[in-house]
UniProtKB/Swiss-Prot annotation:
It is a multi-pass membrane protein. The chain crosses the membrane at residues 23-45, 50-69, 82-104, 291-313, 326-345, 380-402, 436-458, 494-516. It is found in: Cell inner membrane. The complex is composed of two ATP-binding proteins (MalK), two transmembrane proteins (MalG and MalF) and a solute-binding protein (MalE). PROSITE patterns: ABC_TM1. Keywords: Cell inner membrane, Cell membrane, Membrane, Sugar transport, Transmembrane, Transmembrane helix, Transport. Residues 1-22, 70-81, 314-325, 403-435, 517-524 are cytoplasmic. It holds the Pfam family MalF_P2. One of its GO terms (cellular component) is maltose transport complex. The keyword Transmembrane helix applies. This is Maltose/maltodextrin transport system permease protein MalF. The keyword Hydrolase does not apply. Part of the ABC transporter complex MalEFGK involved in maltose/maltodextrin import. Probably responsible for the translocation of the substrate across the membrane.
C-alpha cells in the first residue's frame, strides 16, 4: 500500500508538469504580445498617431482578455474575424469619416506643434558671408575662414566623431595642410552645419553653403504665449489661423492679414468639405454627372453580362450542338485571364491611331472612332471591355441554374403547345431570378467600385473642362475620389476625398438597403 502511495506521489508532479509548462508558455506569449504592442503604442503616440495607438490598445486588450481568461474560451475562435473586421473595415471607415471633417491635404499634413517646430527651425542670413576651406593637417582637420583678406582658423579637431558645437576663430598667416575636396564637405555636412564659429569681434557665424559661413539667425522667435511667432526679418507678428490651418500675419487689432505661411497644420473645419461638394459648381456638377454615369455603367454592365451569359449558357446546353465542351471551354477562357492583362490588351486594340479595331472599322466602313477623346465612345468602349470581362461569370452561373430546372416542366409546357418564348418567360426566368438576384446585386456593387478597369483603360478621361478638381467623363465615383486625393490641382486634398468617399459609402449603403428590401418584397 505504501509503495502504491509512493508511486502516486511521484507521478503526480510529473503529470502536472506538462500543464505547468503550457501555462508558462501561454502567459509568456501573452506577456510578449502585450509588451511589444505596448511599445508600438508608445511609438505611435509619441509621433502623434493617436488613432492608430488607440486601435492597437483596443485590439491588444481584447486579445489578452480573450486568450487569458477561461470564461472567454469560445470567443478565441471568432476573435481573428472580429479583429480583421475592426482593422480592415471599421477602422478605415471611421478614419476616413474623421478625415472628412479636417483640412488634411498635401499642404496641411503636420500637427500644430510640428508645424510650429519647423517654422522655429528656419533661419536667415543677417550679415556678410565668408568663404571657408577645410584643411587636413597631421593632427586633424581645421576650418579656415577668409574675412576682409584676413585668414581666421579654428583649432585643429578630429572630423571623425566630431561633436563640438562652438569653435573660436583666431588670425593666422598661412593655412597648413591639404585642402579637402568638396565631397568631404558634403559627406560631413551635418556635423559642420551644427558648428558655431566665433569671430574675434564677437559675432557668430554658421555654415550657410558648401563653401561659405555667414551670420545666420532664427527667422522666427516664439513669444511668451507659446503660439505667437515674431518674424525677426520683417518685424511681423504671426498667429495660428485655426480656420485654415496656417500661421498668418496679424495687424495691431489681431486681425489676420497677408498671406499664409507654410507648412500648414491639420485643423477641424466641420462640414466645409461636404459644403464644397454641394456649393462649388466645379465639384458639384462633375460629382452629379459621375454619380449618374456610375449608376448607368453598373446597371448596363449587369444587364449586358447577364443577357450574353444567359444566351451563351443556353447555346452550350443545347444537346443538338456538337462539340459543346470545346465551346464551353473557349467561352470560359476570358474569365481565366487576369483582368488587368485583358484590359491592357484592349487598350492597345482600341488605340485610335494604330489599334486593330480602328483599322478593321476603317477598312470595312471607312470610320475611325475616337475611343479615348470622345466621351460617348469612351463610355461605349468601357462597357464593351467590361462586358467581355464579366460575361463568362454570368454564363457559368446560368449554366448551373439551367441544369437545376426540371425537364418535366418543359415537357408539360410542350404538351400545352407553348413555344420557346413562353418557356423562357414562364419557366426559365422565374426559376432563375430568385437565386440570381443576390448575385446580380453583388455584381452591381462590384462594378460600382470598379477602379481597376477605369484606371488602366482610360484613366478617367477624357477630362472635363472647368472643374475645380480633376474629373473625367469615364470616371466612376471611386476613381474620382482617387484623383482628388492624389492628383488634385491644388495638391493632394485628402480631406475632400474623404468627404466624397463618405458620400459614396452612404450612397452604396442606401442602394444596398433598397435592393435588399426590393428582394425581400419580391420573395414574399
Amino acid at each position: 500500500m505504501q509503495s502504491v502511495q509512493g508511486t502516486n506521489a511521484m507521478t503526480a508532479p510529473e503529470a502536472s508538469l506538462p500543464s505547468s509548462k503550457k501555462v508558462f508558455i501561454k502567459w509568456s506569449l501573452l506577456g510578449t504580445v502585450g509588451i511589444l504592442n505596448g511599445y508600438a503604442t508608445i511609438l505611435m503616440y509619441s509621433r502623434g498617431e493617436i488613432a492608430f495607438a488607440l486601435l492597437t490598445i483596443i485590439l491588444t486588450a481584447l486579445a489578452l482578455f480573450i486568450f487569458g481568461s477561461k470564461k472567454t474560451y469560445a470567443h478565441r475562435y471568432i476573435y481573428p474575424g472580429i479583429a480583421g473586421m475592426i482593422l480592415f473595415i471599421l477602422f478605415p471607415l471611421a478614419y476616413t469619416i474623421g478625415l472628412a471633417f479636417t483640412n488634411y491635404s498635401a499642404k496641411n499634413q503636420l500637427s500644430f506643434d510640428r508645424a510650429q517646430s519647423v517654422l522655429l527651425d528656419r533661419t536667415y542670413q543677417s550679415g556678410d558671408s565668408y568663404p571657408f576651406t577645410l584643411y587636413n593637417t597631421d593632427q586633424g582637420h581645421q576650418i579656415v575662414v577668409e574675412k576682409d583678406g584676413e585668414l581666421l582658423a579654428t583649432p585643429v579637431f578630429q572630423l571623425q566623431g566630431f561633436s563640438e558645437t562652438d569653435l573660436d576663430l583666431a588670425p593666422i598667416t598661412e593655412a597648413a595642410g591639404d585642402k579637402e575636396p568638396i565631397k568631404t564637405i558634403v559627406k560631413n555636412r551635418t556635423a559642420l552645419s551644427s558648428v558655431d564659429l566665433h569671430l574675434p569681434n564677437g559675432d557668430d557665424i554658421r555654415m550657410s553653403g558648401l563653401r561659405k559661413f555667414a551670420a545666420v539667425v532664427p527667422l522666427y522667435t516664439l513669444q511668451e504665449d507659446g503660439e505667437t511667432l515674431y518674424n525677426n526679418r520683417t518685424q511681423e507678428t504671426l498667429r495660428p489661423n485655426m480656420e485654415v490651418g496656417y500661421y498668418q500675419p496679424v495687424d495691431e487689432n489681431g486681425q489676420f492679414v497677408g498671406s499664409t505661411v507654410s507648412p500648414g497644420f491639420v485643423v477641424n473645419i466641420g462640414t466645409h468639405n461636404f459644403e464644397r461638394v454641394w456649393k462649388d459648381d466645379g465639384i458639384k456638377e462633375p460629382f452629379i454627372s459621375i454619380f449618374i454615369w456610375t449608376i448607368v455603367f453598373s446597371a448596363l454592365t449587369v444587364v449586358c453580362t447577364l443577357v450574353i451569359g444567359l444566351v451563351l449558357a443556353s447555346v452550350v446546353q443545347w444537346e443538338a450542338l456538337k462539340g459543346r465542351s470545346i465551346y464551353r471551354l473557349l467561352l470560359i477562357l476570358p474569365y481565366a485571364v487576369p483582368a488587368f492583362i485583358s484590359i491592357l490588351i484592349f487598350k492597345g486594340l482600341f488605340n485610335q491611331s494604330f489599334g486593330e479595331i480602328n483599322m478593321l472599322l476603317e477598312g470595312l466602313f471607312g470610320i475611325s472612332p475616337a475611343w479615348f477623346s470622345d466621351p460617348f465612345m469612351a463610355k461605349t468602349m468601357i462597357l464593351i471591355v467590361n462586358t467581355w470581362l464579366g460575361f463568362p461569370y454570368m454564363m457559368i452561373l446560368c449554366m448551373g441554374l439551367l441544369k437545376a430546372i426540371p425537364d418535366d416542366l418543359y415537357e408539360a409546357s410542350a404538351i400545352d403547345g407553348a413555344n420557346f418564348i413562353t418557356n423562357f418567360t414562364r419557366i426559365t426566368m422565374p426559376m432563375m431570378l430568385k437565386p440570381l438576384t443576390p448575385l446580380l446585386i453583388a455584381s452591381f456593387a462590384f462594378n460600382f467600385n470598379n477602379f481597376v478597369l477605369i484606371q488602366l483603360l482610360t484613366g478617367g478621361g477624357p477630362n472635363m473642362i472647368g472643374t475645380s478638381e480633376p474629373a473625367g467623363y469615364t470616371d466612376l465615383l471611386v476613381s474620382y475620389t482617387y484623383r482628388i486625393a492624389f492628383e488634385g490641382a491644388g495638391g493632394q486634398d485628402f480631406g475632400l476625398a474623404s468627404a466624397v468617399a463618405t458620400l459614396i459609402f452612404l450612397l452604396v449603403g442606401a442602394l444596398a438597403l433598397i435592393n435588399l428590401r426590393v428582394t425581400k418584397v419580391a420573395q414574399d
